[in-house]
């Protein structure tokens, strides 16, 4: 019984972090998307990585600013100096162009470990 309660508690913590990550991504999209009709259609699991170095982060940030989906003045958070680890979540977005045609995007959002900012975005 205690074991089941422990698993339930761990699952709720994980779901809470995933929900916080999703909300952070939604807020980022709302603030920085150039198109007025961008919606999230699917959200993957929250995971972590230590394989994204600072030069990759800089390149991903530049790609986003020049890619057309987000505003050129998009602001990103910074990776904390005391860790190489970032959280990551894969998201499927849907946009509509001026003709009303839907276009899907699959993106990976890299987040700081405290879930306070988006550090980089990669279009898959």
What label would you give each PLM region?
Residues 1-15:
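Sec-dependent bacterial lipoprotein signal peptides
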Residues 15-124:
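Cystatin/cathelin-like cysteine-protease inhibitor module
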